[in-house]
Amino acid sequence: MTPIFTNIILAFATAFLGTLIFRSHLMSSLLCLEGMMLSLFILSTLIILNMHLTVSFMMPILLLVFAACEAAIGLALLVMVSNTYGLDYIKNLNLLQC
């Protein structure tokens, strides 16, 4: 495995670990999810280019589109929660609270 692939997998693992550690704040979770999506995009692009997979050239672009949609929905949720509660804690999103 080349050092580039190792660094990208390490970036994904770090972002995933950050999602697990900072799961109480919505903004931190969104940033870690974006880091995961960026590392997946770069990894899939490098794999497709190295293996000359001409059939799946559009897969990284599709992944990037889904990442943009996820970011837009996440930011809309962040704005809604911060306007409603004044905080970005995920525990405020519990539907079982009265």
Curated annotation (Swiss-Prot):
Membrane topology of this protein: Multi-pass membrane protein
Residues forming coiled coils: none
One GO term of the biological process aspect: ATP synthesis coupled electron transport
Any one GO CC term of the record: mitochondrial inner membrane
InterPro entries membership: NADH_UbQ_OxRdtase_chain4L/K, NUOK/Mnh_C1-like
EC number: 7.1.1.2
Pfam family, one: Oxidored_q2
EC top class named in words: translocase
Transmembrane segments: 2-22, 29-49, 61-81
Keywords for the protein's UniProt record, in alphabetical order: Electron transport, Membrane, Mitochondrion, Mitochondrion inner membrane, NAD, Respiratory chain, Translocase, Transmembrane, Transmembrane helix, Transport, Ubiquinone
Single GO MF annotation: NADH dehydrogenase (ubiquinone) activity
Subcellular location: Mitochondrion inner membrane
Reactions listed under catalytic activity: a ubiquinone + NADH + 5 H(+)(in) = a ubiquinol + NAD(+) + 4 H(+)(out)
Summary of the function given for this chain in its UniProt record: Core subunit of the mitochondrial membrane respiratory chain NADH dehydrogenase (Complex I) which catalyzes electron transfer from NADH through the respiratory chain, using ubiquinone as an electron acceptor. Part of the enzyme membrane arm which is embedded in the lipid bilayer and involved in proton translocation.
Subunit structure: Core subunit of respiratory chain NADH dehydrogenase (Complex I) which is composed of 45 different subunits.
Family: Belongs to the complex I subunit 4L family.
Name by which UniProt lists this protein: NADH-ubiquinone oxidoreductase chain 4L
Organism: Avahi cleesei
Lineage: Eukaryota, Metazoa, Chordata, Craniata, Vertebrata
Gene name as annotated: MT-ND4L
